[in-house]
């Protein structure tokens, strides 16, 4: 009797499990019922406009799954990446954009794909005290956009973003240089400040880099190089507070660059 009861219970459990499985399969099958491409795409756009980005990405992906050879599938790939970007899911956006660029290299929206990819990196830029990989990747992507599509409507803003990434990378070099200077590792500090002066000449960090370079040379007792660097600072940034500080460090002597023909960043 006990065995028979157990068999009945086991049988009921099996029936229930089978029903649950069949129900799940039915729901799954129902979720993938093919629908008109325009209906799917419009629903995805409605979700995007409602800022329901998760639902939007799901529906854009569904467009591609159900209608892979439709022109709407190509649009959906790009819009899915855009929805990921809006949701701050930058890694997913970048993956989608890389795939889009690879599959549709001649599409008219490729410049925008590069621009959006650059923005996805740009939004992840961290403080100068931390790793600057995202800054470097943003810079590389924006540079590629400008190189490949110089007349694109996105090129102008990409150039602005490039200047900002340069300033950020220069800030990182300054952060490290100041640390070395504080630790009295003067040669290491000099290399960092020279990197700013040589590679990031248009950034806001150049005046301080010249001042810190002067300071490092003075600490090493290389007075001629200190005076030469201060003269470059005074010639190019005479109203800078950093020149005032360098002027004081050098005993109040004012220095000017002798030759105006020589580029200011090539004096050493």
Predicted feature locations:
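Bacterial N-terminal signal peptides that target proteins for export
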Residues: 2-14
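Acidic, polar-rich low-complexity tracts and alpha-helical solenoid repeat scaffolds
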Residues: 2-4, 21-268
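Bacterial N-terminal signal peptides
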Residues: 14-22
